Amino acid sequence: TAAIVNSTAEMIAGENLIISDEDDRDLEARVKLQNFMDRANGNESLHEVLKKVAFDFKLQGAFALNIVWSKDRTQIAEIYHVDVSKVRCARPDELGKTPGYYISADWTNTRQNKPYYVPAFNTNDRTSPNQIMYAGLYSPNMNSYYSADWVSCANWALIDSRISEYHL
């Protein structure tokens, strides 16, 4: 199953990101976009971030991004991948919207790894310089968290694995 998840994530991410619009009327915007794609954050290109997002999405049915606004809050300055297993949803508001997320390096030991709150991504409220975009596959009755599309066949995969071990 690991090979299936890895190869599917690679197919989701694709080979690279390219700008297909050849219209050079707004060359400055195109150069700015290409620079952002080449360096989405201090260490990675946007495609490298996308590969991590694709892996989380296929493995866990969800992904999380840390969106960093520019100092004047007019545009997105950086995008970082956040390991979705480190993210927990805050209590939803009266409309069912999650106002933010808690992040911890290790949820089994929150005394040493104190969770910290980060507001949810919102283009209308840019007061926080960092915001978390958390998204996944829609599933009925799953309001805050998501499940992977392969979960329904997990028991069959386990049975196949046990049968192959039995016949050794």
How would you describe each model-predicted region?
Residues 1-168:
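Structured, contiguous alpha/beta core segments that scaffold functional sites
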